[in-house]
Amino acid sequence: ILFIGSLLIISSCSKKHERSSITGWEYNNPKNGGFEVKLDYKEQATGPGLMFIEGGAFTMGRTEQDVFADWNNVPKTVTVSSFYLDETEVRNVDYLEYLYCINRVYGQSYPEVSKKALPDTLVWRDKLGYNEPYVLYYLRHPAYQNYPVVGVSWAQANDYCIWRTDRVNERILINEGILKEDPEQIDDNTFNTEAYLVGQYDGIERRLLKNLNPATGEKRRKVRMEDGILLPRY
């Protein structure tokens, strides 16, 4: 037990006083300027409803003998980076949550924002079929709330991803005790990941992180991307 305890103490001390391999200066030392490095970072957390897909490489093109010698499908190795994917399709209830949130925040001052986000329900109409009930009820009726949302354009999908990134990161900061919930957000006084990182949004602060930079004169600071707390953009 004593041996294990000694190893833990030595390990923690070595991490605490780890130095830069290119300058020799200690990390996380306010006496040396306070350059902070997340030494105990393991891996990125998986966002709500996502699953991790490990990347790899595969051969694209001809994989068998070219009998006719056409050489019109030359094989090449393609590398795919690791990425995250939703466990299921985005449901109607998920998109309705998005519509509700942006209407609550921007509906009075910028109603065009809410209108621009509405999916095209007319995609159900077909000359050879009677799909009018889907046009009228598919998006909003509770019977279809767990069905995949349809009629969403590429631009709308990107806006949805930005909104989802902001909501996930805001909840992370609240769960970490850094921010408090603010139900009165409206217009430009709304949490946005990019705005928060560049100092254009503060929110209702609860307890910020310890600041190791003596030049600022502040004991606490906001979260930075280098801290590994916030998730990258969806």
Where do the PLM segments sit?
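Sec-dependent signal peptide recognition
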Residues: 1-4
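C-terminal motif of bacterial Sec signal peptides marking the signal peptidase cleavage site
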Residues: 9-12
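Active-site microenvironments of metalloenzymes and redox enzymes
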Residues: 15, 62, 83-234
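N-terminal pre-domain segments of enzymes
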Residues: 16-46
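Short Gly/Pro-enriched turn/cap motifs at secondary-structure boundaries
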Residues: 41-42, 74-75, 149
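Mature N-terminal segment immediately following signal peptide/propeptide cleavage
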Residues: 43-63
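Extracytoplasmic
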Residues: 48, 55, 75, 80-82
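Short, polar loop/linker segments at the starts of domains and inter-domain junctions
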Residues: 62-80
